[in-house]
Amino acid sequence: NNTTNSKWKKMTISLNYEQTSNNFNKFNTSGINTNGIDSYFLSYAQGLPLDEISAFEGESITQAYSEIGTYFGYANQQAFLGFESFIIEPEDIDNPSNSSYYSNVNNAINNGYYQDYYFKSRGYNSKVNANIAFQYGDNLFLGANLNLHSIDYDQSTYLLESNNTVGEGTGVYVSDIGFENNLSVLGEGVSVQLGAIAKVSDVLRLGLTYDSPTWYTITEETSQFLNTTRYEVNEFETLIIDQTLNPNIINVFQDYKIQTPSKITGSGALVFKKVGLLSFDYSIKDYSSIKFRPSNDPHFIEQNSRISNTPVSYT
């Protein structure tokens, strides 16, 4: 500042790019699980009418999966995959209003299922930061940041389950299941930071920082693939049938917004000339302020209600 009598002495402006996290990951696990993948499909199907989770006559898997997702939602799509693959069976297949189901998966490995699970992800979280800082007089320093956040994330999982057994008597028995799920997430967000440091004396420094919530807008897309091997046993023969359900549909969900918690930090330091310093920080972060929107979405109403009971963090 060239004005002789002005107390504003210095100003700095900067622009930075930071990759805040790297989401590249890959792993595989295998072993015996006491819970089979059939319980996943059963949990979605129970209570749903059969005619809301099945294809109409002459309707393709792709058409049915798309229409069910559009009119009834994600839960019905999962139940549809379970039913069409014979993993689950209605108690009364001739009743369109049937809402009770059972599993065609035979558990014969001593109360367990052999499973291979594959996980792969890629992507990053990044931040562009614009900063401006001032010095006022000799003892006060002020700063502000504007942060633009980006999310780019892809995830793929594949669960392979096998029991290689056939139950007693006639019927349908699913012995092998391969279930793939893909998720793509794109997001943009904005936040601000405000800070001040005061030189109270030659020894004492005090600081105050405010981190605003980050306001994100998130877009999610999913796709699924299911293949099974089943035994159809009757009085005369046993048929082994391999079936693939690939809807070739990308589910594009409505954009939603999420607000992360803000944080206030107070700090202090005692400076002992060239000998050293003693500093402390105290932060308050209210996790109950996390919000999902649109707030009238039934799922978000439940999530926001749970989050509202989260305690405030003091560190």
What residue spans do the PLM features occupy?
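Outer-membrane beta-barrel porins/channels
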Residues: 3-314
